[in-house]
Curated annotation (Swiss-Prot):
Subunit note: Monomer.
Family membership noted in the UniProt record: Belongs to the glycosyl hydrolase 13 family.
Name of this protein: Alpha-amylase
Positions with a binding annotation for Ca(2+) 3: 158, 172-173, 176, 178
UniProt-annotated glycosylation sites, renumbered to this chain: 271
Keywords annotated in UniProt: Calcium, Carbohydrate metabolism, Glycoprotein, Glycosidase, Hydrolase, Metal-binding, Signal
Lineage: Eukaryota, Viridiplantae, Streptophyta, Embryophyta, Tracheophyta
Function, in words: Important for breakdown of endosperm starch during germination.
EC number of this enzyme: 3.2.1.1
């Protein structure tokens, strides 16, 4: 990411905020460190989540975070925001109102932190029934007709809403009507809404929810038109498992899907990345006595970071896999081993709110982020895997940092001269070159 270009594009920022951003440029050149600023239950917070998170801005910024990911901002049938209806209506969000959201974004900007909006545009819930009694009439949340759609904006092969639009370009979302992204009016009005979120509300970047629900070609249209400073797509597909229920050693097909998506959206010329679900799935199992999984057949990392690290956004858990949903949780007693991996390795690491604030891991995570920033580890850093056995994973990053994961202690003979331990915890240790 080029910080100066980002700041030029953000012409709505005040001069004082630009000065703060310039002061943090040394951190930003090391690459993004993302922070998911909510969980599945955040909407329940008394007084509103936006107001609550305002009290965490200083801690998040001080930790070296460059981007904070906020929940879907619009009116939604589902409290968490993932069943959106009136897209322009930010006052109906369970997280707070539009004014509170703008104040929160301004507070993050004042600390040099960019803000990612959770963009849910694969599907949408209707506001009214038509004359046949079918819910297929949508309201945009403005006095005019923007985003006021009918059944012709719904994919005709979708089971909801009796749609008459084009066929779906991606996977079906079972809980709500899938939007016809081939429709030019849909494209035009969604781009207008995204531009409004960026220019009027203050968002800098996008997280694309359920991005497998529409083609990468459609995602490219929205990203190219709105020019976010950063974008990350959720493309969560099933891994290939063996008879024991564990992931197969070879997950090339799984990570190829992620690489293909990024390539179609624009590749190296785009700010788009994808969540590295391949690394997530392998790491989940590897820390349970199978650390050999962390070296692929080619000697490189087995996830997306082994093929295209600059375009991989790594994570340990999120509001779906962890939190109260617990759909694919990381082993709870080994979470810091997961962070030791993603925060010292190539890729764009994302820290989960729960682990940082609720699990008592704040200081340990901060220490790892500090090492990453101090040593200039970036999304495309060079990774050399030194050992990968059942009880030991040892890797050198950029010739400056060595990461050890696993219970084995007798590793000093494997550490080159000129390195010293700078962080350690249950099942992990980090060395820096002196």
């Amino acid at each position: 990411m080029q910080v100066l270009n980002t700041m030029v594009n953000k012409h709505f920022l005040s001069l004082s905020v630009l000065i703060v951003l310039l002061g943090l440029s040394s951190n930003l050149t090391a690459g993004q460190v993302l922070f998911q600023g909510f969980n599945w239950e955040s909407w329940k917070e008394n007084g509103g989540w936006y107001n609550f998170l305002m009290g965490k801005v200083d801690d998040i910024a001080a930790a070296g975070i460059t981007h904070v990911w906020l929940p879907p901002p619009s009116h939604s049938v589902g409290e968490q925001g993932y069943m959106p209806g009136r897209l322009y209506d930010l006052d109906a969000s369970k997280y707070g109102n539009e004014a509170q959201l703008k104040s929160l974004i301004e507070a993050f900007h004042g600390k040099g932190v960019q803000v990612i909006a959770d963009i849910v545009i694969n599907h949408r819930t209707a506001e009214h029934k038509d004359g046949r009694g079918i819910y297929c009439l949508f309201e945009g949340g403005t006095p005019d007709s923007r985003l006021d759609w009918g059944p012709h904006m719904i994919c005709r092969d979708d089971p909801y809403g009796d749609g008459t639009g084009n066929p779906d370009t991606g996977a079906d979302f079972a809980a709500a009507p899938d939007i016809d992204h081939l429709n030019k009016r849909v494209q035009r009005e969604l781009i207008g809404w995204l531009d409004w979120l960026k220019m009027d509300i203050g968002f800098d970047a996008w997280r694309l929810d359920f991005a497998k629900g529409y083609s990468a070609d459609m995602a490219k249209i929205y990203i190219d038109a709105t020019e976010p400073s950063f974008a990350v797509a959720e493309i969560w597909t099933s891994m290939a498992n063996g008879g024991d229920g564990k992931p197969n050693y070879d997950q090339n097909a799984h990570r190829q899907e992620l690489v293909n998506w990024v390539d179609r959206v624009g590749g190296a010329n785009s700010n788009a990345t994808a969540f590295d679900f391949t690394t997530k799935g392998i790491l989940n199992v590897a820390v349970e006595g199978e650390l050999w999984r962390l070296r692929g057949e080619d000697g490189k990392a087995p996830g997306m970071i082994g093929w295209w690290p600059a375009k991989a956004t790594t994570f340990v858990d999120n509001h779906d896999t962890g939190s109260t949903q617990h759909l694919w949780p990381f082993p709870s007693d080994k979470v810091m081993q997961g962070y030791a991996y993603i925060l010292t390795h190539p890729g764009n690491p994302c820290i989960f709110y729960d682990h940082f604030f609720d699990w008592g891991l704040k200081e340990e995570i901060e220490r790892l982020v500090s090492i990453r920033n101090r040593q200039g580890i970036h999304p495309a850093s060079e990774l050399r895997i030194m050992e990968a056995d059942s009880d030991l994973y040892l890797a050198e990053i950029d010739g400056k940092v060595i990461t050890k994961i696993g219970p084995r202690y007798d590793v000093e003979h494997l550490i080159p001269e000129g390195f010293q331990v700078v962080a350690h915890g249950d099942g992990y240790a980090i060395w820096e070159k002196i």
